[in-house]
């Protein structure tokens, strides 16, 4: 008989309380056990004589006491938007950085970026603040300002050496994300973009739980045209629906390569099943646009420079602005006010 996986925990239970750690029991749960994570754990009549009684009775119960503090801290943030992808390497962090810079081209807007890709933080590099550190005051942590109206928070600012690996399990990641939300002086922001790691992991569950009371506006999902990427994006969309996260739209990244010399468009990654636009129609979600592959965008990220300042007329720049305008429309804002024409 081959190896088998344990019966997975119902997804509804995980989403309802992903941060509560199940107590380490010393004996199997008896027949009439109320459940080691229930409010009656260790105190119900059926717990009498159980070897696990003391363990269950001392385990933390009830809602997270820090949630009201998070809600209060983020009271001045108007729109909280997650950026998700089912697969790594599709340009999710790149898109997050470009969305932030596009929104920040409006001098009337104040934008924040929270990097929750704990094990692979790349946002500081892309926004040109990799060498900065966090300043702590009596009222909390100060974010790093990449521009007068663009604030950034990432674990990268806390590393002694920029090449240090972060080898953490879920609880420690959850704790840092909570600190980013509860202890950082975000102040008044028009937009807070949350860059996440690929897939559906502890970081996603934590952010969703911590922001539940202060309301997430929704999520932007990033893909590339090929089916191997779309396959994982379908799972990401399913996660959002089960978690109650509104999908603001799908962005197809690296859709075409437009030659900067002759402007001829070449399909590098073939959309064998119709690409992002077809998937959006299939899943019933908005399609925000397709961003062409432009090596100059990668170069701008490497140097931490604004792609919008360096190549304002490039097809990728124009496409990114259209994505942001489409996103603005989804959250009830005037697209032309969010990213002015020209």
Curated annotation (Swiss-Prot):
Its cofactor is [4Fe-4S] cluster. Binds 4 [4Fe-4S] clusters per heterotetramer. Contains two stable clusters in the N-termini of NBP35 and two labile, bridging clusters between subunits of the NBP35-CFD1 heterotetramer. Its main location: cytoplasm. GO terms for molecular function: 4 iron, 4 sulfur cluster binding; ATP binding; ATP-dependent FeS chaperone activity; metal ion binding. One of its GO terms (biological process) is iron-sulfur cluster assembly. Component of the cytosolic iron-sulfur (Fe/S) protein assembly (CIA) machinery. Required for maturation of extramitochondrial Fe-S proteins. The NBP35-CFD1 heterotetramer forms a Fe-S scaffold complex, mediating the de novo assembly of an Fe-S cluster and its transfer to target apoproteins. HAMAP family: Mrp_NBP35, NUBP1. Residues 1-45 are annotated as: Disordered. The lineage of its organism: Eukaryota, Fungi, Dikarya, Ascomycota, Pezizomycotina. One of its GO terms (cellular component) is cytosol. Pfam families: ParA. Keywords: 4Fe-4S, ATP-binding, Cytoplasm, Iron, Iron-sulfur, Metal-binding, Nucleotide-binding. Heterotetramer of 2 NBP35 and 2 CFD1 chains. [4Fe-4S] cluster 2 binds at residues 259, 262. Belongs to the Mrp/NBP35 ATP-binding proteins family. NUBP1/NBP35 subfamily. ATP binds at residues 86-93. It is found in: Cytoplasm. [4Fe-4S] cluster 1 binds at residues 33, 47, 50, 56. Transmembrane segments: none annotated. This is Cytosolic Fe-S cluster assembly factor NBP35.
